[in-house]
């Protein structure tokens, strides 16, 4: 059995080596994401594990099939996969997931530090200003919290929020309740999980108009949910009181890269970052030691199970 791994993180190497000894397979490894230039690495491989691609569409499936690949595991929740194309080329696809606690806890942290003006506190400390008059914060447990989405991360976040005394309402994608009422009632609106229908929940001018003045928005799901020009207008007009985002539209090529010697080409990101009530983190909510080990472990186990003629709970059918 031979497996190919693309977009491999340094964090995954030790765990992958242990799994290789456990399941006894050969491996081909690349730090680069899968592309036409390095596709030949997967020739004669029984399965392929990918991370970091924006989309895996018709051409990708055609290329994989041309090298004899029958089984594919995707380790990145941000990657859009054309499952119908995969079926046309007889490729079975699994998606590794990480435990919900990482994103749920990080989302809570973002909401807390945003409300307690921690960004401003850090700035002031850099110039030895330890006054606190400008740092008066708010208590999250006194806010009406709205959580958008479904799945384990949403459930776990709701559990944690309720545990500290928050009043929480969840608007799932299959709910029939009024989204307008949800917007009007929520003082803090949190997006912790990628949505199947992001257009329905897109935060644009119309959506913001239905929200409370000074609404707190927290997004650890996907940059595509927020219409950035509308978000900028909302911050400038103070319609948005606090904005915290671990994701950003157009983040690929910036987040998870060292850009200390570069000028950022994403002007919206650079502009928003300078506001004292805006917190932007580099898509790190998932990034824990346990999450990284779990991603590669579930990826390998899924491929091995399918190659050996079994089933995987992570297969997308």
State what each model feature region is:
Residues 1-45, 255:
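N-terminal glycine-/charge-rich "phosphate-binding" loop or analogous flexible N-terminal tail
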Residues 44-122:
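Phosphate/diphosphate ligand-binding glycine-rich loop within oxidoreductases
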Residues 52-53, 192-195, 221-222, 248-249:
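Short glycine-/small-residue-rich Rossmann-like dinucleotide-binding loops
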Residues 56-68, 198-217:
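Rossmann-fold NAD(P) dinucleotide-binding segment
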Residues 104-123, 162-166, 300-305, 309-310:
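Oxidoreductase and adenylate-handling cofactor-binding alpha/beta cores
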Residues 133-213:
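Rossmann-like dinucleotide/phosphate-binding beta-alpha-beta segment
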Residues 214, 223-317:
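Rossmann-like dinucleotide-binding domain for NAD(H)/NADP(H)
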């Amino acid at each position: 059995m031979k497996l190919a791994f693309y977009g491999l993180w340094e964090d995954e190497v030790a765990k992958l080596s242990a799994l290789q000894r456990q399941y006894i397979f050969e491996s081909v490894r690349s730090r680069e994401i899968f592309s036409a230039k390095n596709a030949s690495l997967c020739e004669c491989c029984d399965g392929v594990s990918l991370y970091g691609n924006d989309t895996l569409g018709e051409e990708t499936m055609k290329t994989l099939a041309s090298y004899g690949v029958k089984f594919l595991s995707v380790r990145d929740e941000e990657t859009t996969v054309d499952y119908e194309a995969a079926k046309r080329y007889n490729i079975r696809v699994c998606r590794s997931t990480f435990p919900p606690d990482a994103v749920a806890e990080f989302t809570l942290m973002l909401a807390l530090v945003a409300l307690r003006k921690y960004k401003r506190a850090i700035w002031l400390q850099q110039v030895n200003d330890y006054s606190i008059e400008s740092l008066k914060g708010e208590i999250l447990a006194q806010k009406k919290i709205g959580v958008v989405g479904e799945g384990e991360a949403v459930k776990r976040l709701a559990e944690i929020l309720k545990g500290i005394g928050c009043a929480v309402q969840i608007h799932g994608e299959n709910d029939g309740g009024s989204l307008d009422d949800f917007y009007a009632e929520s003082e803090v609106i949190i997006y912790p999980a990628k949505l199947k229908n992001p257009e329905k929940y897109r935060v644009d001018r119309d959506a913001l108009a239905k929200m409370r003045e000074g609404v707190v928005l927290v997004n650890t799901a996907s940059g595509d949910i927020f219409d950035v020009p509308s978000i900028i207008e909302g911050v400038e007009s103070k319609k948005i009181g606090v904005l915290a985002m671990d994701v950003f539209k157009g983040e690929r090529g910036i987040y998870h890269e060292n850009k200390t010697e570069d000028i950022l080409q994403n002007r919206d990101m650079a502009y928003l970052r300078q506001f004292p009530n805006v917190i932007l983190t580099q898509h790190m909510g998932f990034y824990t030691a346990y999450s990284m080990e779990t991603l590669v472990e579930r990826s390998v186990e899924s491929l091995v199970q399918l190659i050996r003629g079994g089933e995987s709970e992570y297969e997308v059918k």
